């Protein structure tokens, strides 16, 4: 099974979903992380404020921070390879990385615009 490592910028808590001004992208990603875990996916998250040594000890992450700064986070590594930086992925992107069919995601084409109909 593939492993996704997420290196988050410094946040007040492990998910960033706290306080009064919550970033919707973090809410969505936190929900998607839970969904992936239910699908049996291995995910590890590291918060720069809470686990700075994890950033220093990983050579790829260390090099990324030296080149892009903490402003370039989040950094996502899939089996040790960079798959995304600077934003959190959408559920469809996560599904593609892990080979989860889109119908399991609720994003499969449906209705009259899917298939060979001309009703749209």
Curated annotation (Swiss-Prot):
MF term (GO), any: DNA binding
Pfam families assigned to the protein according to its UniProt record, in alphabetical order: ArsD (PF06953)
Entry's Gene Ontology BP terms: negative regulation of DNA-templated transcription; response to arsenic-containing substance
Highest taxon listed in the record's lineage: Bacteria
Signal peptide positions on this chain: none
Keywords assigned: Arsenical resistance, DNA-binding, Plasmid, Repressor, Transcription, Transcription regulation
Gene3D superfamilies in the cross-refs: Glutaredoxin (3.40.30.10)
InterPro entries linked to this entry: Arsenical-R_ArsD
NCBIfam families in the record: chaperon_ArsD
Function per UniProt: Inducer-independent trans-acting repressor of the ars operon.
Record protein name field: Arsenical resistance operon trans-acting repressor ArsD
UniProt source species: Escherichia coli
Lineage: Bacteria, Pseudomonadati, Pseudomonadota, Gammaproteobacteria, Enterobacterales
Gene: arsD
